[in-house]
Amino acid sequence: MKAELIAVGTEILTGQIVNTNAQFLSEKMAELGIDVYFQTAVGDNEERLLSVITTASQRSNLVILCGGLGPTKDDLTKQTLAKYLRKDLVYDEQACQKLDDFFAKRKPSSRTPNNERQAQVIEGSIPLPNKTGLAVGGFITVDGISYVVLPGPPSELKPMVNEELVPLLSKQYSTLYSKVLRFFGIGESQLVTVLSDFIENQTDPTIAPYAKTGEVTLRLSTKTENQALADKKLGQLEAQLLSRKTLEGQPLADVFYGYGEDNSLARETFELLVKYDKTITAAESLTAGLFQSTLASFPGASQVFNGGFVTYSMEEKAKMLGLPLEELKSHGVVSAYTAEGMAEQARLLTGADIGVSLTGVAGPDMLEEQPAGTVFIGLATQNKVESIKVLISGRSRLDVRYIATLHAFNMVRKTLLKLENLL
């Protein structure tokens, strides 16, 4: 199965927006075992769009068009594809009802004839409902080639793909079963080196490493008859991979933290906090609230997080956390002393079970003779106060702050796992 992605919109060609849909769709197609061989961007022009559709139809079995489903005259995708397929546009009853419901709450003058275009589908296609917008998508197969039309805004496209298109394609084509392993504390190059024999000799299942900011994932994939067989094959391979050791002799299982494309260290940590009914607080310097903001993004965060501190300057660390100013000056803000003091004081002041702190040099300049990327992370519980030093070198200021936050979540996660092992 060969797929082609066509992004429709002059704003993509002029650089006004970034085509993030292409990456998302490519990942989804890979999960289904569908190869994406071509990606094309075309402006809001019928003649050029017809040309692109014609070319795609000659070299691909699945053509996915994104964008151009709106109410304006330059939204031409459905109209142009219908013209190419020599089919009419018809109204989808469910989409029409959604339009009625939407405009019933607004002034009558706000509904114009152009709005009706959003409820149209190509005759003979399967409508793809839009749960977060008004423009209905569609799926149609003509002469052995399948065509998909999707809205352009990612907030509309992603739910439509996840909830409508993926289940539909899973029924149409053989499914590729996948499992994503997530690692933190090892780089992609070392992980690939450690697993080089598996990767070089792979057949089925396949192994695909992906480097992300601060972490690495491995996608294990297999084509089998059902989920049970896939789970068995992927589980056996996973056990073999995690039994390997890093170049420093550390078990690879120690830097593995979870499963899933949409998982994260923050989510794993949050779920452990909920599981063990523990509360957490933070005092942040260089990350300026990023740890707390990330934690608060999860529904139900109030179960584990009541509040914390952002103490960017030395004076605020003394004033808000009650740390002795002279001691801070003596040790410096980029120090184990300061990190541990911040974590412990934050815990005591809020009554949380766990206190976390982040202090360091985001860059690009040095601070207190410490190079950019030097970070101290403190962690305090009722029984222990500790800190770690990490060096995040060669990274942008934004990346230093983000990766430091990952280290903080990982430190909390490991602490909670130790608690789990004691139960």
UniProtKB/Swiss-Prot annotation:
Designated name of the protein: Putative competence-damage inducible protein
Family designation: Belongs to the CinA family.
SMART domains cross-referenced by the UniProt entry: MoCF_biosynth
Pfam families linked: CinA (PF02464), CinA_KH (PF18146), MoCF_biosynth (PF00994)
Gene: cinA
Organism domain of life: Bacteria
PANTHER family in the record: NICOTINAMIDE-NUCLEOTIDE AMIDOHYDROLASE PNCC (PTHR13939), NMN AMIDOHYDROLASE-LIKE PROTEIN YFAY (PTHR13939:SF0)
Lineage: Bacteria, Bacillati, Bacillota, Bacilli, Lactobacillales
InterPro entries: CinA, CinA-like_C, CinA_C, CinA_KH, Competence-induced_CinA, MoaB/Mog-like_dom_sf, MoaB/Mog_dom
